Amino acid sequence: MISVRNGNSMKRAKSSWASRMVMLLIVVLILMAGGYGYSTMIEPGLLDITRPVIVVKQLPESLDGLRIVQFSDTHIGEGYSLQQLDELIEKINEGRPDLVVFTGDLIDKFRLFTEGRERLPQSLAKIEARLGKFAVYGNHDRGGGASTYYRSCMEEAGFKLLVNESYPIEMPGERRLVISGLDDYLLGQPEEEAVWSSLEEKDYNVVLVHEPDAAAQWKTIHPLDLILAGHSHGGQVQLPFIGPLIVPPLAEKYVEGHYELESASRSRHLYVNRGIGTTRKKVRLGSKPELTVLTLRRTPA
C-alpha cells in the first residue's frame, strides 16, 4: 500500500509540474506576441519630444535661449506616411523654433516612393523657423536618383541644403551664428577642410552631419561648438541592461542623446537624434521616435 500511495503521489506531482510548464509556456508565448505587437504597431508611433538644455558659458548673449528643433531619419514610405509627417510638422511648429534642422534620410526607398514626391515638398514648406531651415544629406538621400530629388525637394520647401559649406547668420553683437553641413560619410563626398577653413574662432559654430561617429575624429578641429547628427535610430531596439542590439556603421560610438566631447579650446557638444521613422523592419522597442527641441543657455536654468 505504501508503494502504491507513493506512486500516485509521484504521478500527481509529475502532472502538476507538466501543467505548470504548459502554463508557463503559454504565458511566455503571450508575452512574446504582446512584445512583437507593441514593437511593431505601438512604439513606432509613440513620439518622444525631448527638450535638452545645453549650457555654454561662452555663449553669446544674443544666442541665450536659442531654440533649435531637430528632426531626422523620417524614412518616408511603407513605414511612415505623409499624413504622419504632416502631424509631425504641426508639433515642430508648436515648438516655436528659431532654427529647424533635418539631419538626413528623408525617404526610405526612393524608387518605390513615387506617388508622394510632388506633395512632399509642399508639406515640408509648412515648417516655420525664425532664423531659417537647414538640412544635410543622409545615406538614404544618395543614389538611384534620390540625390537630385532630395536637393530639389528641400530647396522647394525652403530649406538650405548644406553640402560641405557654411551659412552665417548675423546676430546682434560681433559673434555670428554659423550653420555648417557635411555631405554623407557613407555614400557622399564629405570635404571637411572646405568647412573647417570657413569657420572663425569668434563665431558660434553649429555643424550638421548625418553619421555621428564622424565627430570622433574632430578632437583637434576647432572652433566647433555644437554638432547635430542622426542615423543611429537609437538602435531601433534596445533591451534593459544590454542597450541597442544593432547599430549602423558610423553610429556605434555615439548612439543617442547628448555627449560633451573633448576639445582643445572650448566646450563642444554633440546631440544624436533617434530619428522619426524606421528602416528595414518597422520595429522600435525601447527606442521611441524622437523630436528634439534643444535650447542653448549661458547658465543653468
Model-derived regions, located:
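N-terminal membrane-anchoring alpha-helices
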Residues: 1-62
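Beta-strand-turn-beta hairpins that frame and shape the catalytic cleft
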Residues: 56-69, 160, 167-180, 200-203, ...
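Active-site environment of divalent metal-dependent phosphoester hydrolases
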Residues: 76-79, 108-110, 139-147, 165-171, ...
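Short, conserved loop/helix-junction motifs that constitute active-site signature segments
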Residues: 95, 124-130, 197-201, 219-222
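Conserved beta-sheet core of the metallophosphoesterase superfamily
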Residues: 212-295, 300-301
